[in-house]
């Protein structure tokens, strides 16, 4: 059978990567000595055009990772979900060893010559794999508290390591990702609300740290100290405002000229808004929204519970990072240091995101193969029970002109629709899937 996959999803991702390469090249066309020194401290020796060359190399590695994720059987990935989660935890703990790199007062990277790697990106991907496996195994016991407790304890262990680095942004995104997937599995809402009440004192304690409270104060009023703590956010506002409707022109932005810090990573969306205007920024946001809708569509058509949760989790993972980045750049959230998937400069985020896309395409290939097989079976049944057939089981004609199939069969034809033995309507090319609780059987 010819393999098929969701080509529109692949086209959207490749378009986002192309936008990212263009934005990285534009934002790094003029590099400040301070930025080069920052990367030299990480052990990464880059020149003016070294950023775009490294991003192109990373894109090549990401394409290889995406192809491998597309080809590996999902059954094998399911079996490897727990070992992969353990490997991600080991990588996360390595930041506290001699392989770890300190930058900006945080230990979030490990040295992999000749570059660096951020384990938090791998953790989020492996957490989606584990939760998909776990919830597909416990989908009939979602009302039990133990089904909720196990993933929460595992998430809590990773949260402790994140806060020790510290990386509050990764901790928040992982927490929101886990809760979202548990909600989809049908976990009782009172468990989630109880967890939220218990977490409130912890969040207050974390925010009360002097440097975090300073970020919150800057978020509330960045113009109070526009040349100090609010400098980055104010410059982001200036970049977005300068772009207007159509932008100042590709490569003509001024904020990248040593005004806006981290313009090639966390605040690259500000530069897109400046050079391409509101229209360009809105189109980028629309691409992410379409990506999310396609991911949800793939999940809703999945026939296997593991595939269902995997597609939902990967779509939510990408969406959370994109929404957080948009919110930080526009001043709706305090600065957190989360890159924009597929677009921001950085190897860890790009490779992880492209691996997630490969898994999504893998799920879409599996449900399309299943749909083709089911359609062939239905076609054969229609021919077997057609009115022109001279031999075969007895048939009765209804007022609507449809034909009845034997009650022992897998499908029943009634009033112009095929029904499964559970008496659920099916079109022959897809299965009905609910928003919560996974695929209906």
Q: Over which residues does each language-model region extend?
A:
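Short, Lys/Arg-rich, polar N-terminal cytosolic tail immediately upstream
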Residues: 1-2
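Hydrophobic alpha-helical transmembrane segments of multi-pass inner membrane proteins, especially
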Residues: 12-18, 26, 37-232, 270-328, ...
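Transmembrane alpha-helices of multi-pass inner-membrane enzymes
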Residues: 13, 18, 331-369, 373
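Transmembrane helices with small-residue packing motifs
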Residues: 30-31
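Active-site-proximal inter-transmembrane loops
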Residues: 106-114, 230, 266, 333-341, ...
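Glycine/serine-rich anion-binding loops at beta->alpha junctions
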Residues: 113-123, 164-166, 244-249, 338-350
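Transmembrane helix boundary and interhelical junction motifs in multipass membrane proteins
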Residues: 167-172, 247-253, 263-265, 278, ...
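TM-adjacent membrane-interface loops and short helices in multi-pass inner/ER membrane proteins
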Residues: 222-265, 279-280
